[in-house]
Amino acid sequence: MRILLVLRGNYYAGQEEFIKNNKLQNYTLDLNALRLLSGSVKNIVSEYKILNVKNDEDLSKILLKLLEMRMQKGEFSIINAYNETLKIYKDLAKQYRYKIYVIVFDSSLKQCQEKNLLEAKKNGYIIPYALLEKTQDLLKKIQKNTQF
């Protein structure tokens, strides 16, 4: 099944619930999971830790390599990477004859901030508010120009 599903939206906009509720964990490549695996965690002054985005360029390359490995075998794949651009996925889809479907999770910044705090209380990791704001702004700009 040559289908690539790209989940777009800010952090905690509903992607994780969608994946869990539909039992899609085994098909999902997630940038935050790679951040945790790479040890990209920073302690901050508060009781929480943050996922360090400093290595995101390298982790994005790893994510794309993992995706390409799946695509070479024709496997159904889901990307949860908070992407502002879809071009790289379009190129891979064309190369491996995949159909792309994009699900946009359009939660407000306030909703994402509230969910961020709730999740931080559960798991000890918080996404910096500045990153939530930056991601929200980028997604707004890009969504206006995105066509499939």
State each model region's role:
Residues 78-89:
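Acidic, metal-coordinating catalytic cores used for nucleic-acid/nucleotide bond scission
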Residues 3-5, 75-79, 100:
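Generic beta-sheet signal
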Residues 21-23, 90-97:
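Short, surface-exposed basic-aromatic patches at helix termini and helix-loop junctions that form
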Residues 15-75, 111-113:
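Conserved substrate/cofactor phosphate-moiety recognition/catalytic segment
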Residues 5, 27-29, 101-103:
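Hydrophobic/aromatic beta-strand patches that form the interior of the parallel beta-sheet core
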Residues 96-115:
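Conserved phosphate-donor/acceptor-positioning beta-strand/loop module used by diverse small-molecule
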Residues 74, 96-101, 144-148:
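Short glycine-/polar-rich loops that comprise or flank the Walker A/P-loop
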Residues 2-8, 13, 17, 25-26, ...:
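Conserved GTP-binding G-domain of TRAFAC-class P-loop NTPases and closely related GTPase folds
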